[in-house]
Amino acid sequence: MSEVPSAFFSSPAAGGIVLIIASAAAIIVANSPLREGYEVFLKYNAAGLSVEHWINDALMAVFFMMVGLEIKRELLTGQLATWGQRALPGFAALGGMAVPAAIYVWFNAGSDETLAGWAIPAATDIAFALGVLALLGSRVPASLKIFLSALAILDDMGAVAIIALFYTSNISFLMLAGAAVTVALLFIMNRAGITRLFPYLLAGGVLWFFMLQSGVHATIAGILLALFIPLRVTDPDKQSPLARLEHGINPWVTFLILPLFGFANAGVALSGMTADDLMSPVPVGVALGLFVGKQAGIFGLSLLAVSLGLAKRPEKSTWLQVYGVSVLCGIGFTMSLFIGNLAFAESPLLVDEVKVGVLAGSVLAALAGMLILRFSPSHPSR
């Protein structure tokens, strides 16, 4: 019997399934008599921060560190190590961010307040999207899984840049200076060849504190720390510090941090919303940005890049399969909810509207993408 849970947790789809369960639980609780207790729990103050802030500002910094480790590994030695490998996912990521943002802006052009959410539909949830692909098994060629992974990594890079550049407020230059000194220390440690993880993690904790107090979102500390974790070691028989850290935190991020984030952020009280709320510019812009904008931007620029000879279609794939993956990328969830919380931090109603839009767009994208890939021909036409 013990083999069953072991097989489940080692499955590529496991993380997405656990995240779905946690998010569904949040929606159920938020629309039940337990709602008040749920809200009290999230607002409970512990060591100066609410539980919700500890999850979104501290635990999610660990998630962003894992994203940063993956980005560094793929850029230096993996699927994005050469310009040729970066071409198709690069064009696709560009279209997959620009078109959803444009659709959102089109629906919200009349309001300066809601325009702040333009980046919400620009992100892809790699855990969900790869989880759906895993459910389809061998029907999807390995090249498409690599394409989706590379695209999502570049998407994450764009989302991180957006958070750092556009969702900061009340900058404390003193704290920012402290963060800069800490980054310089990390650089020196890296150049000095220090391979023990503890000094890096200790400096990372200090960096997180400075970022939290600076006005730049604290999760950026996770990305910055990841950039300085050594990838290469002199002894080829030894695992690199980056690989050790990535393998060490992956299960915690997948099965604890992201489900906690989903439970803390997906709970929306639908009973308190009117039809006008559900069809207002924010949820409609987010949902259509994810479901329509993602597939149009990713597939459109992929087709254009291949047609112009700037990139190559993934091996052993059909254009219909590429389109199916483009639709799947409309699963925004984690990063979209995260950006929504930043964009509308002072407006709980707008945050709830974002949740509705993200859930609607992501569910449509998951179902449509899975159906397209399930029934698409598995061999490219000649």
UniProtKB/Swiss-Prot annotation:
Na(+)/H(+) antiporter that extrudes sodium in exchange for external protons. Pfam families: Na_H_antiport_1 (PF06965). Keywords: Antiport, Cell inner membrane, Cell membrane, Ion transport, Membrane, Plasmid, Sodium, Sodium transport, Transmembrane, Transmembrane helix, Transport. Belongs to the NhaA Na(+)/H(+) (TC 2.A.33) antiporter family. GO terms for biological process: regulation of pH. It catalyses: Na(+)(in) + 2 H(+)(out) = Na(+)(out) + 2 H(+)(in). It comes from the Bacteria. One of its GO terms (cellular component) is plasma membrane. This is Na(+)/H(+) antiporter NhaA 2. The keyword Transport applies. It is a multi-pass membrane protein. The chain crosses the membrane at residues 8-28, 49-69, 87-107, 115-135, 146-166, 169-189, 209-229, 252-272, 286-306, 325-345, 353-373. GO terms for molecular function: sodium:proton antiporter activity.
